[in-house]
């Protein structure tokens, strides 16, 4: 029915109603933690020196939940994506073969089980929580004489409160002329020895001109030293947040060339320094908040890597990295 009458008029003897209050202004932000959780088990590395690492993509996919299943899958010669489900506990070092992706489901873990990547290539370790690997079984992740390795969204730790510094070994060591390695979005915490690049002062013949490593968007917390420690290598560190480093932060030695950008140190002794070697290394430091600590190293010559990357800016690093780094992905 079509209404054709006159429009209703507000009576002149009534006061006009007050206008409604304005709607609150809402600024919507994209939550980086939500975005960071979107992932696929076939993702390839797209950041840093390890870019292009594809792991087991294109091979078989297998889900493992026991030490025996995990060891068999990781050591095989076949290209494979290995999905870790649940908690796996042991006291061993598992040798990881080439063309593997080791992917942790949310809530999965390796306790007492270290990963050993030696003379291999094209390996991805992603969303893995690894802890309490005894020194006799090596590092949480040990990379030797290998190339194209991507460690992403991992949680690496130990039990620092109850044991001395040599009860466990390092959390993540990259040695023996390894090349094209990226460590990204990883939570490195509660340990004495964080991450070592280059294992010995006497290994210059093998390591010089090698050890190209990128550390991007990592959170370092309550680690005494090696955050990281670098001999001989060329290492790019950007968008990292480090706190409670009781002995030292970044240690550059034996001629290492470091580029440190868009990063923050908090409650740290000797943020960028030189310790425990015959000769110093070098560091170019851009937009780094030392948090009242010091950078006492000479400036080097490494000013730009041969890949593109995005700097968050030191003022934005903490909000972007804390709570996002670590085992935070779902697949």
Curated annotation (Swiss-Prot):
Binding of Ca(2+), residues: 139, 169, 173
Listed pathway(s): Glycan metabolism; pectin degradation; 2-dehydro-3-deoxy-D-gluconate from pectin: step 2/5
Cellular compartments annotated: Secreted
Glycosylation site residues: 99
Cofactor: Ca(2+)
The protein's Enzyme Commission number: 4.2.2.2
Principal place of residence: secreted
UniProt xrefs under Gene3D superfamilies: Single-stranded right-handed beta-helix, Pectin lyase-like (2.160.20.10)
Known role: Acts as a virulence factor active in plant tissue maceration.
Database matches in PANTHER family: PECTATE LYASE 18-RELATED (PTHR31683), PECTATE LYASE 21-RELATED (PTHR31683:SF18)
Protein name: Pectate lyase B
Native source species: Colletotrichum gloeosporioides
């Amino acid at each position: 029915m079509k209404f054709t009458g006159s429009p209703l008029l507000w009576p002149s003897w009534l006061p006009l109603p007050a206008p409604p209050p304005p709607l609150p202004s809402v600024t919507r932000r994209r939550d980086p933690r939500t975005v960071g959780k979107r992932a696929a088990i076939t993702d390839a590395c797209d950041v840093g020196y390890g870019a292009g690492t594809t792991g087991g993509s294109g091979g078989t996919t297998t889900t493992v939940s026991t030490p025996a299943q995990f060891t068999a899958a990781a050591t095989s010669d076949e290209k494979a994506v290995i999905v870790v489900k649940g908690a796996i506990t042991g006291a061993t070092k598992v040798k990881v073969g080439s063309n593997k992706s080791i992917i942790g489901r949310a809530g999965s873990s390796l306790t007492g089980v270290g990963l050993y990547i030696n003379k291999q290539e094209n390996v991805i370790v992603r969303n893995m929580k690894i802890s309490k690997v005894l020194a006799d079984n090596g590092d949480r992740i040990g990379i030797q004489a290998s190339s194209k390795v991507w460690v992403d969204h991992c949680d690496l730790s130990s039990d620092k409160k109850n044991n001395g510094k040599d009860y466990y070994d390092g959390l993540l060591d990259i040695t023996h002329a390894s090349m094209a390695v990226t460590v990204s979005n990883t939570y490195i915490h509660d340990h004495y020895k964080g991450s070592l690049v280059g294992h010995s002062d006497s290994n210059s013949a093998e390591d010089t001109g090698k050890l190209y490593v990128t550390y991007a968007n990592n959170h370092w917390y309550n680690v005494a030293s090696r955050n990281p420690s670098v001999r001989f290598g060329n290492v790019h560190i950007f968008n990292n947040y480090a706190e409670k480093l009781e002995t030292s932060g970044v240690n550059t030695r034996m001629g290492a060339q470091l580029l440190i950008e868009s990063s923050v140190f908090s409650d740290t002794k000797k943020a960028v320094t030189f310790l425990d070697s015959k000769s110093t290394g070098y560091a170019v430091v851009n937009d780094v908040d030392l948090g009242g600590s010091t950078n006492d190293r000479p400036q080097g010559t490494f000013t730009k890597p041969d890949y593109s990357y995005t700097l968050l800016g030191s003022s934005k690093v903490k909000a972007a990295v804390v709570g996002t780094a670590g085992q935070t992905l779902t697949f």
